[in-house]
UniProtKB/Swiss-Prot annotation:
GO molecular function, one term: rRNA binding
HAMAP family xref list: Ribosomal_uS5_B
Region (Disordered): 1-49
Organism of origin: Rhodococcus opacus (strain B4)
Biased composition (Basic and acidic residues): 26-49
PROSITE patterns registered for this protein in UniProt: RIBOSOMAL_S5, S5_DSRBD
Protein role: With S4 and S12 plays an important role in translational accuracy.
Subunit structure: Part of the 30S ribosomal subunit. Contacts proteins S4 and S8.
Full protein name: Small ribosomal subunit protein uS5
GO biological process: translation
Source taxonomy: Bacteria, Bacillati, Actinomycetota, Actinomycetes, Mycobacteriales
Domain S5 DRBM, first and last residues per copy: 49-112
Record note on domains: The N-terminal domain interacts with the head of the 30S subunit; the C-terminal domain interacts with the body and contacts protein S4. The interaction surface between S4 and S5 is involved in control of translational fidelity.
Pfam families registered for this protein in UniProt: Ribosomal_S5 (PF00333), Ribosomal_S5_C (PF03719)
Gene behind the chain: rpsE
Amino acid sequence: MPGRQRRDGGSGPAGQNGPNTGDNRGGGDRRGGGRDDRRGGQSAEKSNHIERVVTINRVSKVVKGGRRFSFTALVIVGDGNGLVGVGYGKAKEVPAAIQKGVEEARKSFFRVPMIGSTITHPVQGEAAAGVVMLRPASPGTGVIAGGAVRAVLECAGIHDILSKSLGSDNAINVVHATVAALKGLQRPEEVAARRGLALEDVAPAGMLRARAQAGSVK
């Protein structure tokens, strides 16, 4: 009987602490859920961008103790509406390298001048031994481009364009040559203002008609 009393006594004030501890743990879960909700909101904002991994390579570094292997990733990120960026990430694991590439691409965003679903004028870009030529195309043409060039154009939101890659077929050179070409695009208004001419004297009639149909230049 005394043993029973001791057991019953143990379920007294000390036993009441058990439910209180459970409530505190429940509160911790609620706080954690709040953080998850906030993180979910941030990931939802980032998910609006288009991400394309162009190439993943394994590289090695010779050190005193042997070789150290790591991975590199070339990533294109864009909003599909004229905004695009290129990033290059390096890490010991592939997911970490891709994430670093995405973060670098977001920091290098730039705006591509467009008329509707194509570019404003023919342009050529060069990077190292890579050369890429881009030409505007009529609606319905589609993206006539190879893998690396296509990734950049689709992330930028260009749906009708003609392209040709010359020189090196290295993906890094081709991507940077494509970016150089897109950065070389100019708006007709900028050219007319710099030359002191009217817009009709600078832009072809077909471009003006296409702009009128598609709206303002992005």
